[in-house]
Amino acid sequence: MTSYIERLKSAASYLDTVPDEHHDFRKPTAKVVTTQLTIATSLGIFALLSFSILLKKWPRLYASRRYKDDGNLRLPSWNQSSLFGWLTVLYKIRDEQILEYAGLDAYVFLSFFKMCIKLLSIFCFFSVCVISPVRYHFTGKIDDGNDDDDSESSLIHLVKRIVEGSGDGDNHSAPERTNVYLWMYVLFTYFFTFIAIKMAVAETKHVVSTRQAYLGKQNTITDRTIRLSGIPIELRDSEALKTRIEQLKIGTVSSITICREWGPLNKLFHCRKKILKNLELKYSECPRELRTRQPYSENYHLLGNEQSGAVTHGENVPSSNNNDEDTILYSQISLGERPKMKIGYRGIFGKEVDAIEYLEQQLKFIDAEIIEARKQHYSATPTAFVTMDSVANAQMAAQAVLDPRVHYFITRLAPAPHDIKWDHVCLSRKDRLTKVYSTTVFIGLSSLFLVIPVSYLATLLNLKTLSKFWPSVGQLLKDHQWAANIVTGLLPTYLFTLLNFGIPYFYEYLTSYQGLVSYSEEEISLVSKNFFYIFVNLFLVFTLAGTASNYWAYLSDTTKIAYQLATSVKEFSLFYVDLIILQGIGMFPFKLLLVGSLIGFPLVKIKAKTPRQRNELYNPPIFNFGLQLPQPILILIITLIYSVMSTKILTSGLAYFIIGFYVYKYQLIFATDHLPHSTGKVWPLIFRRIIVGLLLFQLTMTGTLAGFEGGWVLSSCLFPLPVVTLCFLYDFEKNYLPLSKYIALSSIREYERDNSTVNSANEEESYAYPYAVSELEGPMLD
């Protein structure tokens, strides 16, 4: 009896300690997760309803590709009177139609989401049916993490302490002994790793085969062209370069464009574009009947003629003199209603002149300058676009080593003509390298600088630290539990959502000045930059939540890394549940609203005064993988890391990818354009980051198992996994990567035999420098 009373006292003393614990933001209660789910669901439903209503009202804004369609795509339609009719149509669109409607890049992007849905569905099944029940049987916890801070889990601990007789307080802090159920962790770490690798490899084979079949049918000028860099000075001439390439017996050259330092011509065209835009605006402000002086041009110029001519004309026709004077007077009055402008500094100072006449003179002047500039000689750069006579010859040339010297005659497949950034192509080698390295260094320094606010944010959101800096706020949170839950449970996810909203656009801006020669190269580079930022800042820095001294300590003693990572991961489990719920259920549906276009549309519509601006008003927004892809990859990595430990994160991640798949599917097919010509080359970036996620998963599980008494035996069982994982990465780099970059000759020859190669609708494109050959168009008037 005394023993039983002692157990009750011990359990009561344990319960007394629960309410007094400071609620760390890394350990939000399950009630906070429920609140987050309610908020996110409400936001998601609101966004879905709003989009469905706005789609009916403004179909040209939210389904702009249907109206831009020239008849070749034949995008599916739905009943406009139905509020949710678009959902059924979207669901029925097959993979082959995605490839037809949105292109190869969109197909690869959505294939990644489909793979994640299949993978997490398998993980969720085993987690719900096997892992969680076994773990609950042995520990009384559904998930392995600090998710037991609410009253329900406290009751579970109370019962276990009474039944097991663990009244000694020392046992609460002692290392947990190794249990039989921990071998389940080892088993499922192996199982989940091999399932993930198997599905990633299977999806790689699928993407590669689809890419080979899709691109093997193409016979466009883009598919026949290579970009040649490192051209020696003596060969920077079209005829000499053509002769040298054909001497190598790799095919016949159809055409060559030597890139030159056309910088002055670029500046003239940029200036002309501004003048043309201002001229069209002034025409739009002018009454239609006064836009041209043609009816009064003769009389208008008479004002500047010699009086003798006018007198002579008047002597012969005296009856018309009064009519001419009336016409001149009318012309002066009418022309006074035309728009005026000052030609001084920024249009504020200087003489006031007729705006249309002045801008037309400026346009004629700069056109003359451009015509003259086109005749000038410009120094050749070491880059050229070489169009071969066949796709097969272009593929062989792109994969061949043409010169024994280093950095000479380097071949790559050429981007599409519309994908080229000619301002960067025209740069000299010195200027381009300066841009590349200076921008890279600046981005690296910016990334390091951003570690500081993130780490401080992670520290300051701790209730103890808040009390130290703001005692009144800390006391308020201690007195009001609901406020503490909001600040330490919900606030971090929203702050990080805001913090990670603007930084990717900042990196996009910096990348545009990096000197890359095509938009597709910028896009792929942006994927790497943004993923590095959110992975380092949102995951590593925020999870470890320490200062620079902590990181150096981890590096000095590498044995601490796995254990510290496992400990931090456990503490952050419900934080990541909150984050994934908010991003997936709450924020994803808002992407359908195209908030930027929605907010800016009324303003842009008001400012759209010229026919050119009105034509561009309903142009679809540009879909940039560099902005959209990094976060889903990070969410997949987080779910992989927690796959054995947290059923909540697995189910949240599954919901994230299901919602994301249909949101992006709609955007890529109906609402946005993807202009860069990257031909599915984003898949290698995805595969490598899946491998990184698996390695972190294995490292975390090693640290988790090592934390138990005698856990070194279990941890040592996982040592082969990283080696096996890296072997699959090596196999991918050696065998699959070339097929992700190039087209196999057998794929090309197969479709050549079938006579089914596709001559693209863009055959009018060429690699001629556009500013050297394009027409000098006049203002567009309505």
From Swiss-Prot:
Positions glycosylated per UniProt: 171
Keyword ATP-binding on entry: no
Transmembrane regions listed in the UniProt entry: 35-55, 117-139, 182-202, 441-461, 486-506, 531-551, 579-599, 622-642, 649-669, 682-702, 710-730
GO MF, one example: calcium-activated cation channel activity
Subcellular location field: Membrane
Cytoplasmic side: 56-116, 203-440, 507-530, 600-621, 670-681, 731-782
InterPro entries linked: Csc1-like (IPR045122), CSC1/OSCA1-like_7TM (IPR003864), CSC1/OSCA1-like_cyt (IPR027815), Csc1/OSCA1-like_N (IPR032880)
GO CC entries: endoplasmic reticulum; fungal-type vacuole membrane; plasma membrane
Keywords tagged on the record: Calcium, Glycoprotein, Ion channel, Ion transport, Membrane, Transmembrane, Transmembrane helix, Transport
Biological process, per Gene Ontology: monoatomic cation transport
Family stated for the protein in its record: Belongs to the CSC1 (TC 1.A.17) family.
General function of this protein: Acts as an osmosensitive calcium-permeable cation channel.
Name of the molecule in the record: Calcium permeable stress-gated cation channel 1
Annotated organism of origin: Saccharomyces cerevisiae (strain ATCC 204508 / S288c) (Baker's yeast)
Gene of this entry: CSC1
